[in-house]
A protein has these predicted regions:
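Non-heme di-metal
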Residues: 1-140
Length: 140
């Protein structure tokens, strides 16, 4: 099915914690327009495609989105590891820290947990592909 390489698609090496920045980037992980939703969208919609090659393209895209998810998680992890209490308080990171410490949790920047309501899978190829283009900001 997949061949997982134990390395990131692009190396990420953040040396200094920055929980204030992590608060914003976490939305790309689990927010309404984030990589988690994108990967689930494509993996779910592939089954409504009438042609195997189109379903294969959606699987390829979903796999790429999962690679993005891994990179965003790595960024958040590196921005929040080894934080001091002073950094946590200064960044306003306490509410996240109370529930997740420095764990990477899928949520929007506003603190709302990931919700699958941000994606659609209608079982109709045209509807699903139109939703994909809208979600990715493409124009037809």
């Amino acid at each position: 099915m997949w061949n997982y390489e134990k390395r990131l698609e692009y190396p990420i090496k953040i040396k200094n914690p920055n929980p204030a920045l992590a608060k914003f980037i976490i939305s790309q992980y689990g927010g309404p327009d984030g990589e988690l939703g994108a990967s689930l969208r494509y993996l779910s919609q592939r089954y409504s495609m009438p042609y195997r090659n189109v379903a294969g393209v959606l699987t390829d895209i979903a796999t790429e989105e999962l690679a993005h998810l891994e990179m965003v998680a790595t960024i958040v992890h590196q921005l929040t590891r080894d934080m001091t209490m002073e950094e946590i308080e200064k960044a306003g990171f306490q509410t996240y820290f109370v529930d997740h410490t420095a764990g990477v949790y899928p949520q929007a920047a506003a603190g709302f947990p990931f919700d699958a309501l941000c994606l659609a899978s209608k079982g109709d190829a045209i509807t699903d592909l139109s939703e994909d283009m809208a979600a990715d900001g493409a124009t037809a």
